[in-house]
Protein backbone atom coordinates (compact mmCIF):
# COMPACT_ATOMS: atom_id res chain seq x y z
CA UNK A 1 0.00 0.00 0.00
CA UNK A 2 2.86 2.38 0.75
CA UNK A 3 4.28 1.93 -2.73
CA UNK A 4 0.94 2.65 -4.34
CA UNK A 5 0.44 5.77 -2.24
CA UNK A 6 3.91 7.02 -3.16
CA UNK A 7 3.18 6.42 -6.83
CA UNK A 8 -0.09 8.33 -6.60
CA UNK A 9 1.69 11.27 -5.00
CA UNK A 10 4.24 11.38 -7.80
CA UNK A 11 1.52 11.45 -10.41
CA UNK A 12 -0.89 13.76 -8.63
CA UNK A 13 1.51 16.44 -7.44
CA UNK A 14 2.63 17.69 -10.86
CA UNK A 15 -0.97 17.76 -12.08
CA UNK A 16 -1.99 19.83 -9.07
CA UNK A 17 0.81 22.30 -9.72
CA UNK A 18 0.10 22.55 -13.44
CA UNK A 19 -3.62 22.97 -12.85
CA UNK A 20 -2.88 26.40 -11.40
CA UNK A 21 -1.51 27.58 -14.74
CA UNK A 22 -3.79 28.48 -17.64
CA UNK A 23 -2.84 29.34 -21.21
CA UNK A 24 -5.22 30.98 -23.66
CA UNK A 25 -4.47 31.42 -27.36
CA UNK A 26 -5.85 34.31 -29.38
CA UNK A 27 -5.23 35.87 -32.76
CA UNK A 28 -6.22 35.82 -36.38
CA UNK A 29 -8.07 32.64 -37.20
CA UNK A 30 -7.79 33.00 -40.96
CA UNK A 31 -4.78 34.23 -42.91
CA UNK A 32 -4.39 34.51 -46.68
CA UNK A 33 -1.45 32.90 -48.47
CA UNK A 34 1.79 34.91 -48.24
CA UNK A 35 0.53 36.81 -45.19
CA UNK A 36 1.78 36.53 -41.61
CA UNK A 37 0.01 34.48 -38.96
CA UNK A 38 0.08 36.19 -35.56
CA UNK A 39 -1.00 34.40 -32.40
CA UNK A 40 -0.74 35.30 -28.73
CA UNK A 41 -0.81 33.09 -25.65
CA UNK A 42 -1.91 34.75 -22.42
CA UNK A 43 -0.59 33.13 -19.24
CA UNK A 44 -2.60 33.25 -16.02
CA UNK A 45 -2.05 31.64 -12.65
CA UNK A 46 1.70 32.13 -12.83
CA UNK A 47 4.44 34.41 -14.07
CA UNK A 48 5.88 33.98 -17.54
CA UNK A 49 9.18 35.16 -16.06
CA UNK A 50 9.44 32.17 -13.71
CA UNK A 51 12.88 30.62 -14.02
CA UNK A 52 13.50 27.26 -15.61
CA UNK A 53 10.51 27.18 -17.93
CA UNK A 54 10.16 27.32 -21.68
CA UNK A 55 7.04 28.45 -23.51
CA UNK A 56 6.18 26.57 -26.67
CA UNK A 57 4.12 26.67 -29.82
CA UNK A 58 3.04 23.47 -31.50
CA UNK A 59 0.57 22.73 -34.28
CA UNK A 60 -1.45 19.86 -35.66
CA UNK A 61 -2.27 19.79 -39.37
CA UNK A 62 -5.54 18.08 -40.34
CA UNK A 63 -5.21 14.32 -40.10
CA UNK A 64 -1.60 14.49 -38.93
CA UNK A 65 0.36 14.40 -35.70
CA UNK A 66 1.66 17.24 -33.57
CA UNK A 67 4.50 19.32 -34.96
CA UNK A 68 6.80 21.36 -32.74
CA UNK A 69 7.19 24.94 -33.97
CA UNK A 70 9.52 26.36 -31.35
CA UNK A 71 9.89 27.66 -27.84
CA UNK A 72 11.26 30.56 -25.88
CA UNK A 73 12.91 30.43 -22.46
CA UNK A 74 12.04 32.86 -19.70
CA UNK A 75 15.43 34.43 -20.46
CA UNK A 76 14.37 35.22 -24.02
CA UNK A 77 16.45 32.57 -25.78
CA UNK A 78 14.56 30.98 -28.67
CA UNK A 79 14.74 27.61 -30.38
CA UNK A 80 12.89 26.86 -33.61
CA UNK A 81 12.02 23.85 -35.73
CA UNK A 82 14.72 23.89 -38.44
CA UNK A 83 12.12 23.42 -41.16
CA UNK A 84 10.29 26.58 -40.07
CA UNK A 85 13.16 28.63 -38.66
CA UNK A 86 13.34 31.16 -41.50
CA UNK A 87 9.67 32.09 -41.07
CA UNK A 88 9.09 31.88 -37.31
CA UNK A 89 9.46 34.43 -34.54
CA UNK A 90 8.49 33.73 -30.93
CA UNK A 91 8.64 36.56 -28.42
CA UNK A 92 7.64 37.31 -24.83
CA UNK A 93 5.84 40.34 -23.44
CA UNK A 94 6.50 40.21 -19.71
CA UNK A 95 4.40 43.29 -18.98
CA UNK A 96 1.33 41.48 -20.32
CA UNK A 97 2.42 38.03 -19.13
CA UNK A 98 2.08 36.59 -22.61
CA UNK A 99 4.11 35.19 -25.47
CA UNK A 100 3.52 35.35 -29.19
CA UNK A 101 4.06 33.51 -32.45
CA UNK A 102 4.56 35.05 -35.86
CA UNK A 103 4.73 32.80 -38.92
CA UNK A 104 5.43 34.64 -42.15
CA UNK A 105 4.70 33.76 -45.77
CA UNK A 106 2.06 31.21 -44.91
CA UNK A 107 0.89 28.63 -47.43
CA UNK A 108 -1.76 25.92 -47.46
CA UNK A 109 0.81 23.63 -45.83
CA UNK A 110 0.58 25.79 -42.69
CA UNK A 111 -3.09 24.94 -42.22
CA UNK A 112 -3.33 23.51 -38.71
CA UNK A 113 -4.66 23.91 -35.21
CA UNK A 114 -2.08 25.91 -33.26
CA UNK A 115 -1.46 25.40 -29.55
CA UNK A 116 0.64 27.13 -26.94
CA UNK A 117 2.11 25.14 -24.09
CA UNK A 118 4.62 25.20 -21.26
Swiss-Prot record:
GO molecular function terms noted in the UniProt entry: antigen binding
Region (Complementarity-determining-3): 117-118
Gene3D superfamilies membership: Immunoglobulins (2.60.40.10)
Listed InterPro entries: Ig-like_dom, Ig-like_dom_sf, Ig-like_fold, Ig_V-set, IgHV
Alphabetized UniProt keyword annotations: Adaptive immunity, Cell membrane, Disulfide bond, Immunity, Immunoglobulin, Immunoglobulin domain, Membrane, Secreted, Signal
Residues in the signal sequence: 1-19
Region (Complementarity-determining-2): 72-78
Cellular component GO terms, alphabetical: extracellular region; immunoglobulin complex; plasma membrane
Principal location class: secreted
Subcellular location: Secreted; Cell membrane
A GO biological-process term: immunoglobulin mediated immune response
Chain residue ranges for the region called Complementarity-determining-1: 45-54
Start and end residues of each stretch annotated as Framework-2: 55-71
Key word Cell division present: no
Intrachain disulfide bonds: 41-116
Annotated region (Framework-1), positions in chain: 20-44
Domain Ig-like: from-to ranges: 20-118
A Pfam family of this chain: V-set
Region (Framework-3): 79-116
Quaternary organization: Immunoglobulins are composed of two identical heavy chains and two identical light chains; disulfide-linked.
Cited function: V region of the variable domain of immunoglobulin heavy chains that participates in the antigen recognition. Immunoglobulins, also known as antibodies, are membrane-bound or secreted glycoproteins produced by B lymphocytes. In the recognition phase of humoral immunity, the membrane-bound immunoglobulins serve as receptors which, upon binding of a specific antigen, trigger the clonal expansion and differentiation of B lymphocytes into immunoglobulins-secreting plasma cells.
Stated name of the protein: Immunoglobulin heavy variable 4-30-2
Species assigned in the record: Homo sapiens
Amino acid sequence: MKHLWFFLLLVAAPRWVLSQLQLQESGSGLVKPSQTLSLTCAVSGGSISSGGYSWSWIRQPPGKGLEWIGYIYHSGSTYYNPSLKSRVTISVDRSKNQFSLKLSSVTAADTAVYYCAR
